[in-house]
Amino acid sequence: MSIDLSLPELPILHPRITVVGVGGAGGNAVNNMIQSNLQGVNFVVANTDAQALEKSLCDKKIQLGINLTKGLGAGALPDVGKGAAEESIDEIMEHIKDSHMLFITAGMGGGTGTGAAPVIAKAAREARAAVKDRAPKEKKILTVGVVTKPFGFEGVRRMPIAELGLEELQKYVDTLIVIPNQNLFRIANEKTTFSDAFKLADNVLHIGIRGVTDLMVMPGLINLDFADIETVMSEMGKAMIGTGEAEGEDRAISAAEAAISNPLLDNVSMKGAQGILINITGGGDMTLFEVDAAANRVREEVDENANIIFGATFDQAMEGRVRVSVLATGIDGRNNKSETSPISQSEDSEKEKFKWPYSQSESTQDKTLETKPAEQVSEGAKWGSNIYDIPAYLRRKK
């Protein structure tokens, strides 16, 4: 009689990272990441515009607010985007509920991204994703917002709407990275195409996700786990992220200096950062002295009391080159952590309806229409108009 002894197969345990692209800008960012073949990430797109969803390269699509918008878009009205996300919140949660980490990317200043992104972030914060691959317990989803602000040529109306959207989104995300589209002019030239410029902005999101995933899944001498990432990013407010890659003499220093001077981000400095995540990647020829030089160059930029988490990974495709990725959190000089949950802190403000400009209640709107000449009233302000009868692509031409 033979006894067949076999070891049980170990389950594949790894953090589940989800990226949700909200609205047109968010959907474009997801398309660019899919085209760049970013691995280890679950992609989802959510939009009120059915035509935009049809063109998406993403397999997982959420049509926001079918009853509210009929698939015709939000008409640049954030309240419509918010209502559409609230209508579809159950479907949204089906896609994100088992995530350990959630990236929400959107463009601020329009309707869907500005209104829906905070709703999704709030749902993620209130949810408690079961971490089944550890001790059975409930744990919140670590949520990161990566959003853009409008170009200057988009007009004065979109910027205040974008600022209100950022203020609302920051209530619910652990970390927020803001990319002003206007900063694209810092790195563009006269021959840079419009499409290529936006890809540069989308690359910031790509850098952030790759920097996190590489530290946890790439082979290396110093690997980090998800708990390390969470320590630096949980409840940390505004953040900046950068990456640099160099070869030749002093490649480590050059890569580090490029990483800490990202020209796309929103006039932020690492000086007051409370948490720093450093990822140094190189081929088999990367030396100990190079790792030391790159890490110390980044450390020079931050307070000595900052919580610095460091990882070094190997990638044979990086032979002859060194890449340094830096994520600095808590750069607004505050840590949102407190004994009171951010959700309970914001309950009072939630009692009052969050009001965007150009989406007044009917009573306020009537007074506005009486006191302003007709030609000064924006089409978007006419809440009672049949906005949903006009396709989104036509409304955008107005």
UniProtKB/Swiss-Prot annotation:
Enumerate the UniProt keywords alphabetically. Answer: Cell cycle, Cell division, Cytoplasm, GTP-binding, Nucleotide-binding, Septation
* One GO biological process term: division septum assembly
CDD domains annotated for this entry? FtsZ_type1 (cd02201)
* A Pfam family the protein falls into: FtsZ_C
Gene Ontology MF annotations = GTP binding; GTPase activity
Stated role: Essential cell division protein that forms a contractile ring structure (Z ring) at the future cell division site. The regulation of the ring assembly controls the timing and the location of cell division. One of the functions of the FtsZ ring is to recruit other cell division proteins to the septum to produce a new cell wall between the dividing cells. Binds GTP and shows GTPase activity.
How does the record describe its quaternary structure? Homodimer. Polymerizes to form a dynamic ring structure in a strictly GTP-dependent manner. Interacts directly with several other division proteins.
Q: What's the name of the protein?
A: Cell division protein FtsZ
Origin species, per record, is Wolbachia sp
